[in-house]
Regions:
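Ser/Thr-glycine-rich phosphate-binding loops at phosphate-binding pockets of nucleotides
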Residues: 1, 44, 93-96, 143, ...
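Gly/Ser/Thr-rich phosphate-binding loop
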Residues: 54-107
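AMP-binding/adenylate-forming catalytic core of the ANL superfamily
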Residues: 144-180
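Conserved acidic residues
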Residues: 38-40, 63, 145
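Alpha-helix N-cap/helix-start capping motif
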Residues: 45-46, 70-74, 171
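AMP-binding/adenylate-forming
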Residues: 1-50
Length: 180
């Protein structure tokens, strides 16, 4: 959806990489009716789960998938281990304009941490939350994400200091739900 930065960045990636865009209506299984081989697809974890359950062969015909909008569960990570598609979890937020780090989720080179892109540097603030420095950003981005910082390029995401739940890119505040 190009109303969001993630959708806009898919268009930018296609222009930069010279790849075709295959647009589908937002759905729980965007590969369901796609017959051709794809080079690149962006999904949320629920879509990946549905594809694994109902259209796995279509995922295996896809060269690369990025997964964002929410954390990928351990059970889903197990289900994708043998996929022929290279699958990466993304770390991003609107303030960073796009992904700043990837975690390879499957295959022999799977990672248990995110690794920041070149020219992105990371540190922790006094709360233990991730701070992002990038040459294209005007100032440091201070997040509410608690992480285990391995070095200035690698981290493990632990959760949110403010208890906000990110589900498909929608931020849910448990305290607001309790008042309903």
């Amino acid at each position: 959806d190009t109303k969001y930065i993630a959708g806009q960045m898919m268009l930018v990636r296609s222009f930069v990489l010279g790849i075709n865009i295959v647009a589908v209506e937002p759905t729980g299984n965007p590969l369901e009716n796609i017959e051709q081989q794809l080079d690149f697809v962006a999904l949320v974890p629920l879509q990946l789960e549905n594809i694994i359950n109902y259209s796995r062969e279509r995922l295996d015909r896809t060269r690369c998938a990025i997964i964002g909008g929410a954390a990928v569960s351990n059970s889903l990570k197990e289900k994708i281990q043998n996929s022929k598609c290279n699958i990466f979890a993304t770390y991003s937020m609107p303030e960073t304009l796009s992904n700043i780090a990837l975690q390879k989720l499957n295959g022999n080179d799977a990672q248990d941490y995110f690794e920041a892109f070149e020219k992105i540097n990371l540190r922790l603030d006094n709360r233990g939350c991730l701070c992002i420095n990038a040459n294209y950003l005007g100032e440091e981005v201070v997040t509410n994400d608690l992480v285990e910082l391995i070095d200035n390029k690698k981290f493990r995401w632990l959760g949110r200091i403010d208890n906000v739940i990110n589900s498909g890119g929608i931020k849910i505040i448990p305290e607001k739900i309790e008042t309903v």
